Structure formats: structure tokens, C-alpha cells
């Protein structure tokens, strides 16, 4: 069974890599014809650096989360019950861990390929230069909005994707192990290990949401507002206070998630999610 998964993983990797290799070779010939090979090499190096770093970090985080959650499996998992002449298919814990590692590698590869397309964002951040002029609302140098803010957005979205995938994969693993279940009478039943793990992941998610609200405040100056570009009266009077409130609520949600991770109560987590949704919906309705 593991050999089949390895073969499938290799096939999927080749399916994604071969078309990219053809495009890469075509671009190499074109840049060589116009005598811009050095520019192509620099671009390629930036893509490989960004994509490789994102792949390594994402794979490490995802694989660690998946394998930690799958470590709670104590008995073979029935993947296919079989029937007639078809034998049932079961997976042992070691096989499930191998599968989890393969899924982590595949997800990290997708994230790495996506990140490699943002090579210019990385280079602009790496070689950022101040403009010597500040915006009148927040007092930040204009270079922050041109070079730094796009990179911070890019980094946050990647971290958010890794955190969400970690939460989804770990939750599925705990369901497989029976550590996480839904009881019609008692509601969610969560083992201590699963509670601590998932609570910490959700706390990280809330921190990333808080960071997003923090970045959304200066981003207002770079977004169109009706017929003008930048912050409007509604943005200054309403949206910015709402975003700062959302930042505070997300930080509170992170703390409440940690409380849920360390105690046998689910109420703090439900309160955290409810507060965040309430402030988000209220802010969107108020800005209409």
C-alpha cells in the first residue's frame, strides 16, 4: 500500500514539474536571444529562493502537525470495508504517518510554486529604499506602502494558509484516531492531547487574523474609495476604528483559545469565534 502512495505522489510531482520545465527552457532560449541571460538568471534565482524556503518551512510545519496528530492512532484505520471477493483495506499507524507526510509534501509544493511567482515582491522588499516622504495620516514613509506592505501581506497569507491546512489536517487525523468525535448529547468530545494541539493552532490563527487587521489599517491608503484613491471620510471615521477593534478581538480570541487548550471547557473558544464574527459582520454592515 505505501508503494502505491509513493508512486502517486511521484506522478503528481512530475505532472506539475514537467510543464514548468518546458516553460523554463523556452524562456531561457528567449532571454538568450535578446542578450538578457543575467536578468533571467537573477529572476530564476529569486524564484528558487522564495519557492524553496516556503516549501521547506511549510513542509516542516505541516508534517510535524500531521504526524503529531496521527501519533494518537492506536488501531488500524479501515479505509475501505471491502465486500464480496474484495478484501478490506486498512492502514496502520506507520502507513498513516507516511500518508500524512506525503500530503504535507504535496501541499508544501503547491505553496512553494505559488510563492515563487511572488519573486518580485521579495526582491522589492529585500532592496527597499525610503522615498523621504511620509503619508499625512500615519506618518509612514511612502516606501513602506510600495515595498514593505505587499511583502508583509504575502507572508501573512502564506502563514495563514499553512495554519489553516494544519488545522484541517490535524482535525481529520484526530477524527481518524477517535480522539475527536461529536456526541449528540454532549457535543464535541475532545481528548486532552487533541485539545492542546488544536487549541494552540487556533491561537496562532487568531494571531494571524490580528496581524491582518493591523496591516489592513495602512492598506486603506492604497485602496480606491469611490472616485478617489486612498482613505475616505468613512475609512477614517469608521473602518479604521473597526479594524483596530478587530485587532483587539483577535488578540483576545488567541488568549481564549489558549485557555481552551489548557482547560476541559469549550466555551472560551466559542466566545472567541462569536466575538470575532460579531465585530466583523458589524463592521461590514456599518461601512455600507
Regions found by a protein language model. Give the residues of each.
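Contiguous transmembrane helix-bundle modules in multi-pass membrane proteins
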Residues: 1-29, 38-140, 149, 153-288
